[in-house]
Amino acid sequence: MAPGAGLYVFKVLDYLGMGQTSDSIRALKYIKENCVRLNIKILNFSVGYLPCSDTAERIKILKLIDELWDMGVVVVAAAGNYGPAPFSVTVPGISRKIITVGSFDDIRSGKGPTDCCIVKPEILAPGHDIISLGTRDGTYVRKTGTSMATPIVSGAIALLLEKNPNMRPEAVKLALYNTCD
């Protein structure tokens, strides 16, 4: 989608898609310490944690995500797949600041409002039967969920920043709002 974009990949999940919040915290701290040097403009966070467990670690994730946003990194997070009930958006998608992505073609897509009455997700993208890499043998597989929808929005943002490299995250979010139907 954005062939001129460079990528840094941070592994926070195992081959089964399972992970610890501590792995995400470690990756987020590294990104925070190195985002200027590495010229990281967008953080695609296709991982979600339920807000009700490991509260202290989830608060750390939210704090780091918000700090990255304040430093000028556009943070795009998956809404999670615990919907369609209200209050089902996962951490870090519940952050007031960041852009949270749901899947318009998956009924399990996380849905707001958050417990702080924030309307989430802000944007929807395709997330059903998306062709992706397999984890075991490098073949392609079909995957479904908000983790598949989130990179589509991140790619669109990369194109926007290619033309407007000095846009702040707030302006990027507003541009998305103003162009969505």
Each model region followed by its residue ranges:
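Subtilisin-like serine protease catalytic core
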Residues: 1-22, 36-41, 94-97, 113-120, ...
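Residue-level detector of functionally special positions within alpha-helical transmembrane segments
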Residues: 4, 46, 80, 145-147
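Hydrolase catalytic cores
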Residues: 8-14, 43, 127-181
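A generic structural signal for short coil/turn motifs at secondary-structure boundaries
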Residues: 15-20, 51-55, 142-143
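Short, conserved glycine- and acidic-residue-centered signature motifs
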Residues: 20, 57, 94, 146-149
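Extracytoplasmic/secreted envelope proteins and their assembly/folding machinery
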Residues: 21, 25-28, 62, 86-89, ...
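Catalytic-core segments of hydrolase enzymes
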Residues: 40-133, 177-180
